[in-house]
Amino acid sequence: MNKSIVFSGAQPTGKLTIGNYIGSIRHWVEMQKHYQCIYCIVDLHSITVRNNLCSLHTRSLDTLALYLACGINPDISTIFIQSHVPEHSQLNWILNCYTYYGELNRMVQFKEKSSRYKNNINVGLFNYPILMASDILLYQTDFVPVGEDQRQHVELVRDIARRFNNIFGTVFKIPNVLISMYGSRIMSLLNPTRKMSKSDPDPNSYITLLDNVDCISKKIQGAVTDSDSPAAICFDPIKKPGISNLLAILSGISGQSILNLEESFQSKTYAQLKDVVIQELSCMLKDLQCRYISERSNEGKLNHILNVGSQKARMQAQITFKKVNELMGFYKES
């Protein structure tokens, strides 16, 4: 029996946080056992923000090496670079013509990013969700694992797919959202009401997968907690966002449930909680970093994985895009 298809992607920053790992990548690893997984390094999405384009190639390989170090297996999952499959961009233009301005204008993430990047509010940033729709719909995706902050984008993808299907018949599968109960949204260490982000101007607000032990210790020790006495270690994101964030991090890396952690820290201090988080994080990341160094040093292997992945992805993408092209009535090359 054919497995359901999961599609997910991340930008090639070359720098993933523990938020990326706990909220996304550890779930990607587990999903490989149950789904046909397609994981895309979305380099086209990444140019909506002004980064150093000269390093995009290097960052793409860094990101792949991190995926492998985390446990993504190219023998059972398809891993590829978005720009290597031109059907993404081609379908993007077609779906542009079946998406309304008002729909994009309601996207919360566009409003947040345009306020953050006031000198670069480009059309690509505005159209970002349509390219995301192309990414997902090309592969007849069943499930899209996303954080709560991306749910609105996937709902738009579903709306676009339904609209296209209503006009042309069933072309696209309507994807569903997969959201984990805990760990989908790891928050900033310094402002636990905001999502942890590697683009945060203060590096003490996040921990990357390549941070060393001293760096991890410093950042966790400086993480926001509470001033109540005696300490009350419980999961309550509204009343105790800092403590809840540390519990979510510890749960994500240790595999223990939030409930079990609450019980084990019932009579402990905030300092003791931080010490355990530091110990668990340092141990996990030390092993991961050793695997990363090994993978990143073999550039030939990385290139081979991407070449094979792109070929597999394009074969699937072309099936969908050919059907779309025929329905649109485009003149065929003779």
Swiss-Prot record:
Disulphide bridges: none
Extent of motif 'HIGH' region: 12-20
UniProtKB keywords: Aminoacyl-tRNA synthetase, ATP-binding, Cytoplasm, Ligase, Nucleotide-binding, Protein biosynthesis
Catalyzed reaction equations: tRNA(Trp) + L-tryptophan + ATP = L-tryptophyl-tRNA(Trp) + AMP + diphosphate + H(+)
Alphabetized InterPro entries for the sequence: aa-tRNA-synth_I_CS, aa-tRNA-synth_Ic, Rossmann-like_a/b/a_fold, Trp-tRNA-ligase, Trp-tRNA-ligase_bac-type, Trp-tRNA_synthetase
Single Gene Ontology BP annotation: tryptophanyl-tRNA aminoacylation
Class in the EC hierarchy, top level: ligase
UniProt keyword annotation of Protein biosynthesis present: yes
UniProt GO MF annotations: ATP binding; tryptophan-tRNA ligase activity
Classification via Pfam families: tRNA-synt_1b (PF00579)
SUPFAM superfamilies: Nucleotidylyl transferase
Protein's cellular compartments: Cytoplasm
Binding residues annotated for ATP, in chain numbering: 11-13, 19-20, 147-149, 186, 195-199
Gene3D superfamilies hit by this protein: HUPs (3.40.50.620), Tyrosyl-Transfer RNA Synthetase (1.10.240.10)
Assigned protein family: Belongs to the class-I aminoacyl-tRNA synthetase family.
Subunit field text: Homodimer.
HAMAP family assigned: Trp_tRNA_synth_B
Protein name: Tryptophan--tRNA ligase
